[in-house]
């Protein structure tokens, strides 16, 4: 955001800004690209003076806890390639997700819960597809893939015993299956057989750990009030934020929350407000909650999407309505917690918020920085596959963004 952007409303985006850059097929045929001024009020908050929208008042209130990165960028311009890219470090399918990489590299301190858990909530906007490969293990051993917790019914499918099967009989069945699997492993030395044995055992232990984890009756009323009106509604973002904190307390090292609905090609003024209502209070509450419990210094909270949106209107621009197309050239994310510099604003874009003019942060740079916070050198964190030492940050190279790190982490 820049105050001068309000003067640009309705004027054509100069061709020099686009400079022949690729845009989506949804707007490539437009004859006019009128700029749209910010639809909401922005004010500066915190010691950093970062600008926050009026529809994110709770995130604005933690401005001094976060680093605001205004120069994130990606080459992808459509949803699935972009989500795949930011999760796996490449637009090509078949690569491990960040959670799988970290599960592989760091392991999990919990014997009773997976090392990587995914939860999905749905906003009130249109929902793009989310494929299970986004939390998959790719070419890493399959034991490192994420486990999706469902928003209704059984959190994990087939975890509960079917009618007529007791815990004792389930134990006996597993022992018999494991004996067969161990014999097969002795014959073939296939590591995936060991993975299967371990996953069966984990599922058995989760029959006790998951019900305890997902029972929010033990949470006091003030916690629900802190997270907002949806905090008691399964499947909502606020509910998932509380579950995420409980997972972290129980030793789950990597929790990923997807909130769908951020695709306002039309009806921006209405739908963006609704989406922000879903996430603003819970996201800020999670940071505060972790801090109050002494957990924030050991936890990294990352909030953002796969790309930004254009300054120009998609379709006609009217007094009350407009849309915005995908824009990967620059967008904003924020981070908080262990190793992250507090109250900092990083990066700058041009007057049209179309291109980055200072301190660009590619998504692979962002992932390299997260690994640094976890004590991992992203260049040495590799897995040999197809003749290459594969990395989460890609084989082309990435850099740690030291400017958003606390001083103690710059030289690990």
For the regions a language model picked out, list residue spans one by one:
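Ligand-binding pockets and gating/stacking loops
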Residues: 1-409
